[in-house]
Amino acid sequence: MSVKRVLASAPAKIILFGEHSVVYGKPAIAAAIDLRTYVSAEFNDTGAIKIEAHDIRTPGLIVSFTEDSIYFESDYGKAAEVLGYVRQAIELVREEADVNGKGITVSITSQIPVGAGLGSSAAVAVATIGAVSRLLGLELSNEEVGKLGHKVELLVQGASSGIDPTVSAIGGFIHYQKGKFEHLPFMELPLVVGYTGSSGSTKELVAMVRKNYEEMPEIFEPILNSMGRLVEKAREVITSDLDRELKFQTLGKLMNINHGLLDALGVSTKKLSELVYAARTAGALGAKITGAGGGGCMYALAPGKQSEVATAITIAGGTPMITKISREGMRIEEVEE
């Protein structure tokens, strides 16, 4: 029976611990969270790739109208960028399946804000690979889907650690160091992600930290070493058989310390700090930046306090997303035959 349509989904990711220090060979822990991008794929008879984007979230899109023009005040290009990943993903899978001329229509809806540092590009690439490979009769494991997702990022961006597509494809917790991935045991984490509505340039922030590090290695080296040790401590806690409450408390403390160290590197902003402190005041056990900083998102660990923390983030001017760790990575939602 040939397949007519496939719907696949893939989750967003957050860096739990170790952003920036990971650039210096230290470990990092990332996790998939329960915000998903859905991609459905079906054949068309034009031979072309057709992409329908129904709902790509670009929060903060501002449009002004004057008598004779329409002006986009915010970065509309970010939504268009996503399409580059989709196209590349389809082309790669068509090559793998050896059916280059087949017309495919994909349709995208997403719960993941674009440009927020939550891996929206990787999620759309991974979900596209999942849907299109199944449509073309390729049986790929989630690990193989992640590897193809990494290839897509390399082709589109020119550089990629592979963290985002690996986490999105496999789900759960991933420990990463110097190109090596390790899947950690699963644990529930009740989280609230807070989006500032703006994004920093990862490239510029990494370059700024590098410059400071080169100017004052004796000051920056201990900060980066502390970050590395903190990640290993977090891994110890996640893999331990301590009771849940104790795990939450220790991870919360480590989050707060990690945020302080990131602040010392100079990658926080006034808005990120406001969201972090609002979350802590509302009862979060820990809150920190996730990702490169300079904008983007923070996240808070808030067992039993998710709605209070979400309200506090809103009052502080952020966009809250109540979520949890996603045990599953890419998954096939439905297949129409």
Swiss-Prot record:
InterPro entries: GHMP_kinase_C_dom, GHMP_kinase_C_sf, GHMP_kinase_N_dom, GHMP_knse_ATP-bd_CS, Mev_gal_kin, Mevalonate_kinase_arc, Ribosomal_Su5_D2-typ_SF, Ribsml_uS5_D2-typ_fold_subgr. It holds the Pfam family GHMP_kinases_C. The active site is at residue 164. One of its GO terms (cellular component) is cytosol. The keyword Lipid metabolism applies. It catalyses: (R)-mevalonate + ATP = (R)-5-phosphomevalonate + ADP + H(+). Its cofactor is Mg(2+). Its main location: cytoplasm. Gene3D superfamilies: 3.30.230.10, GHMP kinase, C-terminal domain. Keywords: ATP-binding, Cytoplasm, Isoprene biosynthesis, Kinase, Lipid biosynthesis, Lipid metabolism, Magnesium, Nucleotide-binding, Transferase. One of its GO terms (molecular function) is magnesium ion binding. The keyword Iron does not apply. One of its GO terms (biological process) is isopentenyl diphosphate biosynthetic process, mevalonate pathway. ATP binds at residues 113-123. Belongs to the GHMP kinase family. Mevalonate kinase subfamily. Catalyzes the phosphorylation of (R)-mevalonate (MVA) to (R)-mevalonate 5-phosphate (MVAP). Functions in the mevalonate (MVA) pathway leading to isopentenyl diphosphate (IPP), a key precursor for the biosynthesis of isoprenoid compounds such as archaeal membrane lipids. PANTHER family: MEVALONATE KINASE. This is Mevalonate kinase. The gene is mvk.
